[in-house]
Design a protein with these regions (language model features):
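Early transmembrane hairpin of solute transport permeases
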Residues: 16-184, 371-374, 381, 385, ...
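Transmembrane alpha-helical segments and their short flanking loops
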Residues: 1-14, 31, 37-54, 94-106, ...
């Protein structure tokens, strides 16, 4: 596709900050919600009696954001600044993180388990990277041709459709779903108009304009609802913002110091034993292989967008090392292993901005913003419906990117037709495989099925 900014291009400083801010908004909501979900899982385990210790020091979303920024910088370093994608908290490891806390003798030991588990996952990436370094990547192309990768990329976006629509329809307690949908659709419409009809600057920052427009409309409804006492019109929950000065205006109103994972982990490292380490390996290593499959799909997707094969230059071994080590760094600070974000890839595609300088700046901003209380509070106050509208475009574009790859496949050949069909139905249908606490996600299951079907049907018929 035609890019406005290529990988090595460096926009002017003012533009760079705005573009980076847009990348940050695209990945921030998902990155912040992973530690929140994990906190909820741990508290649920405590309520059920499965966990008996207190969970006073919960995981910090701000620390996860900082970890994502640091992880992205590590990734950029390993990939020689040739791959324009941001790393964020991985949803694939949610079960693994819950298992790390569930098997620990204390919350502090659980935090140590998060780091050890991420190290196991990162080690899987390092081992695969070493194999790729010596064996090359041609086997990847043979194992995962376009008829396999194309529909897999498509289902990465399509499998998130329910999340986007669910968020679009989400209203606060007492709020009306139709009002929420209206606000989300305003954000989506403005984003599309800016991207298609906007002048150069508007074309490059459609998501910022769309989110702010949706937020403004939501704020108008909320103000009217508060003034008239009509709960149905209340869309925005301003409590994250008002909480900043609930105890008076202090330094914490403006700046905060996130509670890093390694700080709590150091207190619990003495409580770690061999059995617990073994359980961590069982919880994290299989998931790492699943995420490896998604890693390839993401990089095939971004390669098609920038029209450069990232698996060959800088090389799959470098992208794996960057992802693996970046994931470990993210876990040390935020507790969450990182992964390449499809939202970031979609943002690059829609805006035509593949500048790695933008990604680096976004990573630096993520690190700095993690300490700025008002900004984190503002992001937390953005209504789910607004982000749902934006995600309809982001996730949709991921799906379309995969379908564009399928366009190049000869679907008149029944072999290709069956491969694509199996992947799409298994992925969209949500075919996940569970082995105890280990889950192979629907995307990974669909990819594995596609590979197997392609191999079986590729066998030459005997004369």
């Amino acid at each position: 596709m035609k890019l406005v900014y290529n990988i090595k291009d460096k926009p002017k400083f003012g533009q760079l900050i705005v573009f980076a801010f847009q990348q940050l908004l695209a990945i921030m909501a998902a990155t912040l919600v992973v530690p929140v979900i994990t906190n909820g899982n741990v508290l649920a385990a405590i309520e059920s009696g499965a966990v008996t210790w207190e969970f006073t020091a919960q995981m910090s979303p701000a620390a996860a954001l900082l970890g994502a920024g640091l992880g992205t910088l590590v990734y950029i370093l390993f990939t020689k600044a040739k791959s324009p994608v941001f790393l964020g908290s991985s949803f694939a490891f949610l079960g693994s993180m819950a298992a790390a806390f569930a098997g620990a003798v204390s919350a502090q030991a659980g935090y140590a388990g998060l780091i050890i588990g991420a190290a196991f996952a990162g080690l899987v990436y390092v081992v695969i990277a070493a194999i790729v370094k010596f064996a090359g990547v041609n086997w990847i192309d043979k194992l995962m041709p376009k008829q396999v990768i194309g529909p897999t990329v498509a289902i990465i976006g399509l499998s998130l459709a329910g999340n986007a629509v669910g968020d679009l329809q989400k209203a606060p307690a007492g709020g009306h779903t139709l009002i929420a949908v209206l606000c989300g659709l305003v954000a989506l419409l403005v984003t599309m108009l800016c991207s298609v009809f906007g002048k150069k600057t508007a074309k490059l920052i459609p998501f910022i304009i769309g989110i702010l427009s949706g937020y403004a409309v939501s704020a108008v409804f909320t103000v009217i609802g508060n003034a008239a006492g009509i709960d149905a019109l209340k869309v925005i929950d301003f409590s994250p913002i008002t909480a900043l000065w609930a105890d008076g205006v202090t330094i914490n109103t403006f700046f905060q110091f996130p509670e890093f994972t390694f700080v709590n982990a150091l207190k619990g490292i003495k409580e770690i034993d061999g059995a617990y380490i073994g359980s961590l390996a069982m919880a994290y290593v299989p998931v790492a292989f699943v995420v490896f499959a998604e890693h390839i799909a993401d990089h095939k997707n971004i390669s098609s967008i920038i029209e450069k094969d990232l698996l060959k230059e800088p090389g799959l071994h470098r992208t794996l090392l960057g992802d693996g080590v970046g994931s470990m760094v993210g876990a040390v600070f935020g507790g969450c292993p990182n992964t390449t974000y499809g939202e970031s890839v979609a943002c690059v595609a829609i805006t035509g901005n593949a500048s790695v300088a933008t990604i680096i700046t976004a990573a630096v901003l993520a690190i700095l913003i993690a300490f700025v209380s008002p900004f984190v509070a503002f992001v937390n106050s953005i209504p789910s419906c607004v982000m749902g509208g934006i995600c309809m475009a982001l996730y949709g574009f991921i799906a379309v990117s995969g379908l564009k790859m399928v366009q190049k496949v000869n679907l008149e050949d029944n072999r290709n037709l069956f491969v694509v069909s199996v992947i799409l139905i298994a992925g969209i249908g949500g075919l996940a495989l569970n082995f105890g606490k280990i889950q192979i996600t629907s995307i990974a299951t669909a990819l594995i099925l596609g590979i197997l079907v392609n191999i079986i049907l590729s066998k030459k018929k005997k004369a």
